[in-house]
Design a protein with these regions (language model features):
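A contiguous, surface-exposed recognition patch within enzymatic or periplasmic domains that forms
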Residues: 1-32, 149-203, 210-213
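Hydrophobic, proline/glycine-rich low-complexity stretches
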Residues: 1-90
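HotDog/MaoC-like acyl-thioester-processing domains
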Residues: 2, 74-162, 226-233, 237-267
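Small/polar glycine-rich anion-binding or flexible loop at a beta-alpha turn
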Residues: 32-36, 204, 219-233
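Terminal targeting signals and extreme-terminal segments of soluble enzymes
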Residues: 54-66, 193-202, 206, 244-246, ...
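Short, basic/aromatic beta-hairpin or loop at an interaction surface
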Residues: 62-74, 195, 206-218
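Short conserved catalytic/interaction loops centered on acidic-Pro-aromatic/His motifs
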Residues: 104-106, 216-220
Length: 267
């Protein structure tokens, strides 16, 4: 175990998240946290002195900080939920690095890291999670497609405005100081992006919320991939479609380019 932390799960982070997303908050003491809402608990809270120029912690974090000349991206993951994680009770999260693999990509060397989290409460494992992290050279550029025409929103789609305030509040709720999400000058002048980057976890959470519209019970396997960067000016459109093998979810920008995809397989 590389990291372990225990805390009492208070209702306030969940209530703040519900306000941020304009979604209903369930009875947190009985129904427990909805799918992926555990991301707002048991957080790493580094000291200000331990942050680098980009806002990333530079030491004592899991996964490891990017290091000089490298950037870190959340590429996807899988969350297995065994039951409700309830507020008002203590919970423990144990984190390990499961694997590290170096590969050569089209834009340069890549390092793939798999981080595993296990969240327990009242002596039972409630959440098992795998996060896929990718490190790349800072000199390699992300592919940014032209926006193109705006497409209409279908009846089964959920449009979300990606505003600077939304990104800032999401960063605050997750104690994420990475400047690419709220500092437009830094995004443009240092990292060369055309706008503020939408958090990968925010896209995954939006897909989970769209799936919650079809099924409240968080139990099951949710697997997701982040396939393309999403910038604030491009907007976010979320969709969830029930099927015989589960609920298929996706995120696209307002121009039709898919940026994330996921599947919830209920138990």
């Amino acid at each position: 175990v590389r990291d372990e932390r225990t805390e009492i799960l208070l209702p306030e982070p969940a209530q703040a998240l519900g306000a941020l997303l304009d979604v209903p908050v369930p009875d947190l003491a009985t129904d427990g946290l909805p799918l992926l809402w555990h991301w707002f608990y048991l957080l790493d809270r580094p000291a200000q002195a331990d942050l680098g120029p980009d806002g990333h912690p530079v030491r004592d974090t899991v996964p490891a900080p990017p290091g000089p000349g490298r950037r870190r991206m959340w590429a996807g993951g899988r969350v297995r939920t065994h039951g409700p994680l309830r507020c008002g009770l203590p919970a423990t999260k144990r984190t390990t690095v499961a694997s590290t693999q170096d590969k050569q990509g089209r834009t340069g060397p890549l390092t793939f890291v798999v981080v595993e989290h296990v969240v327990s409460q009242a002596g039972s494992v409630v959440v098992e999670e795998r996060q896929d992290i990718v490190y790349r050279d800072a000199g390699s550029q992300l592919t940014v497609a032209d926006d193109g025409p705006v497409l209409p929103v279908a009846e089964d789609e959920w449009p979300v405005e990606i505003s600077p305030t939304l990104l800032f509040r999401f960063s605050a709720l997750t104690y994420n100081a990475h400047r690419i999400h709220y500092d437009r000058d830094y995004c443009r002048d240092v990292e060369g992006y055309p706008g503020l980057l939408t958090h990968g976890p925010l896209q995954a959470l939006a897909m989970a919320e769209a799936a919650r519209g079809h099924r409240d019970d968080p139990r099951g396997d949710f697997e997701y991939r982040l396939t393309s960067p999403l910038f604030d000016h491009q907007g976010m459109v979320v969709r969830a479609v029930p099927g015989p093998d589960g609920i298929t979810t996706s995120v696209r920008d307002r121009h039709g380019r898919q940026t994330a995809a996921g599947t919830l397989r209920p138990w």
